[in-house]
Design a protein with these regions (language model features):
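Signature of N-terminal electron-transfer/Fe-S-associated modules in redox systems
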Residues: 1-158
Length: 158
C-alpha cells in the first residue's frame, strides 16, 4: 500500500509517496538518490546505514520510511555546509580514517553523535561508542585517531 510521507532531509522539505514497506535507507538511496548512506548488513548490525533523525544517530536499515514522518533527517551528504566539510569529515580525511570507505559515512555519523553526547570522550569511550559500527579494513586505529583529532579542535590541512 502506498502512503504519503513528509519530512525534512538535509534541511530540505520532502513529500513523497512510498510503499508502506519501504525502509528509510531505501527511501534515501532510491527515492532521493542520497547514496552516501550505505547498506551493509541490512540487519542493523554494521552501522553503514547510520543517519541522524532529529539529532540522534539511528540505523536507517531498521526503520520504515513511514516511521520518520515529520522528522528531520541528516545524511552524510547533509553534514558539509557551503562546500566545507564537517570537521569530522575533514578529520577522517586528515588522519586517513578509512581504507575502502564503505563504512565511513556511517562511522562519521556515529562519531558526530558520539562527540555531541560526550565531547571529552576518552579513547576507551570512543571505542565503546563505535560499538555499533563495523570496519573490516582499518583495525579502527585511524578511525579513533580521526575522532580524537576532531575532538581536539585541530584544523585539517586543505
Amino acid at each position: 500500500m502506498d502512503i504519503p510521507i513528509s519530512l525534512t532531509v538535509n534541511g530540505k522539505s520532502v513529500t513523497k509517496t512510498v510503499d508502506s514497506r519501504t525502509l528509510l535507507v531505501q527511501f534515501l538511496r532510491e527515492n532521493l538518490q542520497l547514496t552516501g548512506t550505505h547498506v551493509g548488513c541490512d540487519t542493523a548490525q554494521c552501522g553503514a546505514c547510520t543517519v541522524h533523525m532529529n539529532g540522534r544517530a539511528i540505523k536507517s536499515c531498521s526503520m520504515l520510511a513511514a516511521q520518520v514522518q515529520g522528522s528531520q533527517i541528516t545524511t552524510i551528504e547533509g553534514l558539509a555546509k557551503n562546500g566545507e566539510l564537517h570537521p569530522m569529515q575533514a578529520a577522517f580525511r586528515e588522519c586517513h580514517g578509512l581504507q575502502c570507505g564503505f563504512c565511513t559515512p556511517g562511522m562519521v555519523m556515529s562519531a558526530v553523535q558520539l562527540l555531541a553526547d560526550n565531547p571529552k570522550a576518552t579513547e576507551e569511550e570512543i571505542r565503546e561508542g563505535l560499538d555499533g559500527n563495523i570496519c573490516r579494513c582499518t583495525g579502527y586505529h585511524n578511525i579513533v585517531k580521526s575522532i580524537q583529532f576532531c575532538q581536539s579542535g585541530a584544523k585539517a590541512s586543505a
